[in-house]
């Protein structure tokens, strides 16, 4: 069984995007100044938005890049020659600063997640995680899972920045199943997004349970195989699929 991260296990309001951006821009200004590079906050703010356009182009092809490339895109937007001028030490500090905002003000967790995962693990299900990232890398998201006591339930975790593929491309599901030695016909994916999770996992040959408050979601070939409002209902939903 595979699960999604954002909108399924953990939830972050849209306002977090701007908060994280402000934190990153402020940290970049401080780190670059200490390295002898003058970059105004206004220039970094603009560069951050330009890096978003770069990422959107990559993501629109269902592909992904490591967060090192996020940082490089920001520096390039400030000054095309800047990535070559910063030292390896400074680059490492920038990458760390870019990755950490979600750890400083962590997103909310579905409070029923731990109990649901424990119940499924107790029934012998092998659990894995399949998730796209936005700007917080997989290494940060694993630390959040660990903080909430969830990481240990997963035999394998797949994050798009680490494998170069994003949902809904079925390959990100396929490579996760290969890591588990599992076949798609016997696997179930759990996620919230109708395209990334439902269509993506179906294209990979898996069944899907969608986490959504819309109980009217149609089931069947074009919709999920089951619907739950929260992860508290997952053990029963899985039992229903297997019945």
Predicted regions located by residue number:
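Asp-based, Mg2+/Mn2+-dependent phosphohydrolase catalytic module
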Residues: 1, 5, 18, 30, ...
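N-terminal helical cap/lid subdomain that shapes the substrate entry/recognition surface
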Residues: 1-118, 122-123
């Amino acid at each position: 069984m595979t699960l999604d991260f954002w909108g399924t296990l953990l939830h972050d309001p849209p306002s977090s995007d701007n908060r994280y951006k402000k934190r990153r821009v402020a940290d970049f200004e401080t780190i670059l100044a200490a390295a002898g590079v003058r970059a105004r906050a206004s220039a970094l703010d603009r560069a951050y938005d330009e890096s978003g356009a770069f990422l959107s182009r990559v993501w629109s092809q269902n592909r992904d890049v490591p967060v090192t490339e996020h940082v490089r895109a920001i520096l390039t937007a400030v000054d095309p020659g800047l990535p070559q001028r910063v030292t390896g030490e400074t680059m490492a500090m920038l990458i760390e600063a870019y990755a950490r905002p979600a750890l400083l003000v962590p997103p909310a967790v579905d409070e029923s997640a731990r109990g649901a995962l424990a119940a499924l693990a107790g029934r012998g299900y092998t659990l894995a995680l399949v998730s796209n990232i936005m700007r917080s890398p997989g290494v940060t998201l694993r630390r959040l899972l660990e903080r909430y006591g969830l990481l240990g339930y997963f035999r394998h975790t797949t994050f798009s920045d680490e494998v170069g593929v994003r949902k809904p491309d079925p390959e990100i599901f396929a490579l996760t199943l290969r890591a588990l030695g599992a076949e798609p016909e016997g696997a179930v994916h759990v996620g919230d997004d109708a395209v990334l999770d439902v269509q993506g996992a179906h294209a990979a040959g898996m069944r899907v349970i969608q986490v959504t408050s819309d109980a009217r979601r149609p089931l069947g070939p074009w919709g999920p195989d089951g619907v739950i409002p929260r992860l508290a209902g997952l053990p029963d939903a899985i039992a229903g699929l297997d019945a």
